[in-house]
Structures are given as structure tokens and as C-alpha cells.
Amino acid sequence: MASQTIPKLKSVLYCDVCTLPVEYCEFEGTLKKCKEWLKSSHPDVYDKLYGEQDLSKDLENTLNVSGTKDSNAEEQPAKLTKEEKRVEREEAKRMASKVLIKTIERTKRKRVTTVQGLDAFGIETKKAAKMLANKFATGASVTKTADKKDEIVVQGDLNYDIFDFILEKFKEVPEDNIKIVEDTKSKKKQ
């Protein structure tokens, strides 16, 4: 056997904003944020990828068609693309939504726990119901509420257990967005 040269592995730099290689950031909807991150974290790579483009854009912004300097060009903020606006709206909507965990009393001493709002975070409610049923060895189903939203109904009083389960299994749901609603019905005095 002749001496074989083993090729070295290439090191790929991934963007912290969109999690793609930095060469592909332009295909994601967050190019402006990706450029800002790359410029602050890896200025040499930023100059290699976007250095000439930024210079030409700066020249276009500072000089208008007649060649005179435009004072408003520097003051105007860069407009977000439709994709970036859509992504920001979805993120804001997702962060504003809440997951409600509520226990409802049924006949005699039986209780059911309902979980609403998981679908706002991109979690499939049927799969979540199946996971809850397996975890707590109880019945769980997906039903539609009066306002046409999915809710998971789990048999048993499992408020805090489900709270911990959601934090453990579904990392995309922040702890601040999970709310346990206590059912405080006054019982009849006998």
C-alpha cells in the first residue's frame, strides 16, 4: 500500500440565529439579524461574504442619482422584508400565548385535567395526548373547545405533574407561559 493522504475534515461555521451554515443565511428570513451576528462574532468571515456588497450599498445610499450626498439615507432604518416581519409576528404571537392546565370536577370524586394552548407552540396535540396517557397510565384524548381550539383531556387530578411533564418534554414552551388554573368551587355545607 502506498502512503495515503487522509483528507482533513472541513470546519463549517453555523449561524447562531438561523442555525444554517453562514453561506445559506440569505435563504432564511432573518438575513439582517444573521449579518449582525456574523459581523460581531466573526468579522473576517463577514468581510469575506458580505464585505463588497455592503460597500456598494453604502455608496448607493450616500449618493443619489445626481452624485450628491443624501442626508436622509443614513437616517432611514433598513426595511424588514415580508418574511422577516412574518417570522417576528409568529414569534410574538407564540410568546404571547399561554398553556392553561385546569382541573375540572366530574361526578362524585372524579376529576379530569384539561390542557389548552399547546398547539400555539407547534406541538401536535394528538402526540402529546398519547405521551401523557403513556406517562401517567391514564386515559387522554383530544377534544375541540367551543372556540374551535384543541384541548387535551386527561383523566385524573394531574395539574402539577402535567406542568412538570410539559417543561421536561416540550422545551419550546417557556415556563412563564404555562399557567395552572385552580378550580375553586365552594362545596355545600352539610
From Swiss-Prot:
Major subcellular site: cytoplasm
Annotated localization: Cytoplasm
Transmembrane segments: none
Subunit relationships: Interacts with the 40S ribosomal subunit.
Membership in a protein family: Belongs to the DENR family.
Keywords assigned: Cytoplasm
UniProt-listed PROSITE patterns: SUI1
Span list, region Disordered: 63-83
Domain SUI1, residue spans: 99-170
Free-text comment about domains: The SUI1 domain may be involved in RNA binding.
Gene Ontology terms for molecular function: translation initiation factor activity
Keyword Cytoplasm on entry: yes
InterPro entries reported in the protein's UniProt record: DENR/SUI1_TIF, DENR_C, DENR_eukaryotes, DENR_N, SUI1, SUI1_dom_sf
Protein name (record): Translation machinery-associated protein 22
Recorded GO CC terms: cytosol
